[in-house]
């Protein structure tokens, strides 16, 4: 009985060592699990970006409105005879301190170009 017990204890020790420290043990499993989670998060971000790009491509292929909007926003273009107004936040915002009847007032400046 002593030899069988010793053999089982040694086998149990070897299995525990393999589980915790050995190749493909718990540490490797946790590292790979973290790597998979990181890659899945990265894939989700890239999929979202791809979906946005495909939607933008569809808009650009669909008509002139998307192209016109892009020209206005990114290139600052306007149509002939059109007046462009840009609202600029006021740098001198008035801040009031006191009663609840007083309010914060800030009025945007307006600039126009032809």
UniProtKB/Swiss-Prot annotation:
Periplasmic side, ranges: 22-114
Membrane topology: Single-pass type II membrane protein
GO biological process terms held by the UniProt record: FtsZ-dependent cytokinesis
Any coiled-coil regions, as ranges: 31-62
Parts of the chain that traverse the membrane: 4-21
Key words of the record: Cell cycle, Cell division, Cell inner membrane, Cell membrane, Coiled coil, Membrane, Transmembrane, Transmembrane helix
Intervals, Cytoplasmic compartment: 1-3
GO CC annotation, single: cell septum
Keyword Cell division in annotation: yes
Main location group: membrane
Cellular compartment(s): Cell inner membrane
Role: Essential cell division protein. May link together the upstream cell division proteins, which are predominantly cytoplasmic, with the downstream cell division proteins, which are predominantly periplasmic.
Complexes and interactors: Part of a complex composed of FtsB, FtsL and FtsQ.
Name this polypeptide is given: Cell division protein FtsB
Lineage of producing organism: Bacteria, Pseudomonadati, Pseudomonadota, Gammaproteobacteria, Enterobacterales
């Amino acid at each position: 009985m002593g030899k069988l017990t010793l053999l089982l204890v040694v086998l149990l020790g070897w299995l525990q060592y393999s589980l915790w420290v050995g190749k493909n043990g718990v540490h490797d499993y946790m590292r790979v699990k973290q790597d998979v989670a990181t890659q899945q998060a990265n894939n989700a971000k890239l999929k979202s970006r791809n979906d946005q790009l495909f939607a933008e491509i569809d808009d650009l292929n669909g008509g002139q409105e998307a192209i016109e909007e892009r020209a206005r926003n990114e290139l600052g273009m306007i149509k002939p005879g059109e007046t462009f107004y840009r609202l600029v936040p006021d740098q001198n915002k008035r801040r009031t301190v006191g009663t609840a009847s007083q309010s914060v007032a800030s009025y945007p400046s307006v600039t126009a170009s032809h």
